[in-house]
């Protein structure tokens, strides 16, 4: 197993100057790249890492030349936010990364210097990032056999002039949020097939709906309407679902079977309740926090989905 790399082919094109310049939004944000709860992530540390990458990593230099470095800089901030959330989760869940396993992961990625270039961090942060990867996998493994959600919803497809599938899905989501007691009736409109069931995280793995396992569906509070696109690569199909309940079973059950990448993604999703509880604020020069995607987005138009609090949820 190697450290999960950061460089991705699909990036948005905005100038590097936007990343390296810009204005803060006030005294509480001006010297911070992000604020997680009461903890500030120093802006100068993020800028220092950006400068190191531009000076030492050819892939980062290529992105800068293509004017595509903005999305990469948001990934830097995202990883630091995730680290802060993970510190809270690890303390609550009693998780620890074995130092020997951390070393092995780094060595399997070519050592500290090569790993730094692979994942896009300064060498002195490689060990922290490797430990975070292991902890996220542990967190995912811990919740796979225990977590389930009770949902009612439907899949929205098809577009019409002036109305995309996302538009229609969002409109349905807002209707459900306004009258959650009518959710089954509302989702059945237009001949849609109603999804009204309890989804167990462990049962989704290996199924045709495996993509849902790491989705926002399992990270929101009960009484939230989730509007997401589970498989963007498979066409414009949007899931609209009211999460009526979220249950975490007792410990001691057999751990779920999943590959390390899937466990990592599920672990990341399990940080969503902590992010919601603590609050995450991003310096506007980098964008805004996307709770649906557990990432930093350029603006709300780039959110991975929509999370709408329902007005009431009747038992």
Model-derived segments and spans:
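C-terminal motif of bacterial Sec signal peptides marking the signal peptidase cleavage site
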Residues: 19-22
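Short, well-ordered alpha-helical segments enriched in acidic and aromatic residues
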Residues: 183-193
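Secretory-pathway/luminal and periplasmic proteins that interact with or process carbohydrate-rich
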Residues: 111-116, 193-199
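Sec-dependent N-terminal signal peptides
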Residues: 5-16
């Amino acid at each position: 197993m190697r450290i999960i790399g950061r460089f991705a082919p699909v990036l948005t094109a905005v100038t590097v100057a936007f990343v390296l310049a810009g204005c803060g939004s006030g005294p509480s944000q001006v010297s911070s790249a992000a604020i997680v709860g009461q903890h500030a992530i120093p802006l100068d540390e993020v800028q220092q890492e950006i400068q190191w990458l531009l000076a030492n990593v050819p892939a980062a230099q290529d992105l800068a030349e293509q004017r595509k470095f903005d999305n990469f800089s948001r990934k830097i901030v995202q990883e630091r936010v995730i680290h802060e959330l993970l510190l809270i989760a690890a303390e609550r869940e009693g998780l620890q990364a074995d130092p020997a396993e951390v070393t092995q992961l780094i060595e399997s990625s070519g050592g500290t210097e090569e790993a730094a270039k692979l994942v896009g961090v300064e060498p002195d942060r490689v060990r922290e990032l490797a430990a975070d990867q292991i902890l996220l996998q542990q967190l995912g493994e811990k919740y796979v056999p225990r977590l389930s959600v009770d949902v009612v919803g439907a899949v929205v497809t098809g577009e019409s002039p002036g109305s995309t599938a996302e538009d229609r899905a969002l409109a349905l989501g807002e209707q459900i949020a306004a009258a959650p007691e009518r959710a089954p009736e509302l989702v059945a409109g237009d001949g849609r097939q109603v999804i009204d069931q309890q989804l167990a995280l462990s049962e989704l793995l290996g199924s045709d709906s495996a993509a849902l396992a790491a989705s926002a569906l399992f990270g929101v509070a009960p009484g939230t309407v989730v509007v997401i696109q589970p498989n963007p690569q498979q066409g414009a199909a949007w899931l609209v679902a009211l999460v009526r309940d979220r249950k975490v079973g007792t410990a001691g059950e057999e751990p779920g079977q999943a590959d390390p990448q899937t466990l990592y993604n599920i672990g990341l999703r399990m940080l969503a309740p902590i992010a919601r509880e603590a609050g995450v604020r991003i310096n506007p020069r980098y964008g805004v926090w996307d709770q649906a995607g557990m990432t930093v987005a350029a603006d709300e138009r780039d959110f991975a989905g929509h999370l709408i609090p329902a007005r009431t949820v009747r038992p």
